[in-house]
Amino acid sequence: MFLKTGDKVRVITGKDKGQEGTIKKTFAKENRVIVEGVNKIKKHQKPSNMNPNGGIIDTEAPINASNVMLLDPSTNEPTRVGFEVVDGKKVRVAKKSGKQID
């Protein structure tokens, strides 16, 4: 997967199109990511020791990784991601600007 936790991304399709956020968690096997503040759902929580009152809580649901694009760190615009080998290490590169991402 070309996305990592902490990356700034923009949603490019779906009901949250145009929203930006950082990736909180990635699920590589399912090709899904959780983006902060995007794809909010309401979850009905039963009372438990951690939450004695229970109730309805807002949380983010995972979205498909193909529905988000990484933001180029230099231009803050969505870009595709490529890979290059530099000094024997594989690094991510922004296709628009050609700059290294990590």
Swiss-Prot record:
GO molecular function term, any single one: rRNA binding
GO cellular component, one term: ribonucleoprotein complex
Top-rank taxon, per record: Bacteria
Signal sequence region: none
Coiled coil regions in record: none
UniProt keyword terms in alphabetical order: Ribonucleoprotein, Ribosomal protein, RNA-binding, rRNA-binding
A GO BP entry: translation
Entry's family note: Belongs to the universal ribosomal protein uL24 family.
Quaternary structure (record): Part of the 50S ribosomal subunit.
PANTHER family with a match to the protein in the record: MITOCHONDRIAL RIBOSOMAL PROTEIN L24
Functional description taken from the UniProt entry: One of two assembly initiator proteins, it binds directly to the 5'-end of the 23S rRNA, where it nucleates assembly of the 50S subunit. One of the proteins that surrounds the polypeptide exit tunnel on the outside of the subunit.
Listed name of the protein: Large ribosomal subunit protein uL24
Organism whose genome encodes this protein: Limosilactobacillus fermentum (strain NBRC 3956 / LMG 18251) (Lactobacillus fermentum)
